[in-house]
Amino acid sequence: MKAAVLREINKPLEIEDVQTGNPAPREVLVRTVAAGVCHSDLHFQNGSYPYPLPAVLGHESAGVVEAVGADVTYVKPGDHVITCLSAFCGHCEHCLTGHMSLCGEPELQRAADQPSRLAKKDEA
């Protein structure tokens, strides 16, 4: 799939072909049909919201569910969905000090031994 990738702060986004991994038990794979880059994405781009790079921006999207993890019961393949891919717990130190993009809540993170969610096609 194509993605708007931020590789460096204060640099233009690069449209790249990326591959996605299979969804973990509580994840959903969505084939994006439309996405927008909003003001919060600009905060990532200018470094106001620190976040590990590279990062895919355009977190508000609409699409079709392609696959679901084993524990997902609220959507199924073929469902049309809208998304906001921001995930944070709201109670850790990062969240309470306004740095939700750094939330480290284990329930919201992919385990270190799991493959990356995204890979550039020529780097996969």
Regions found by a protein language model. Name each.
Residues 104:
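A nucleotide-sugar donor-handling region in carbohydrate enzymes
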Residues 40-44:
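Cytochrome P450 core scaffold surrounding the K-helix E-X-X-R motif
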Residues 1-2:
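Extreme N-terminal starter segment of soluble prokaryotic enzymes
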Residues 109-124:
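Charged, glycine/proline-rich intrinsically disordered loops and linkers
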Residues 5-12:
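Extracellular beta-rich ligand/substrate-recognition surface
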Residues 21-35, 46-96, 101, 109, ...:
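Glycine-rich beta-strand-centered segment in the early N-terminal region that forms part
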Residues 14, 38, 64:
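Conserved Rossmann-like nucleotide-binding pocket used by diverse enzymes
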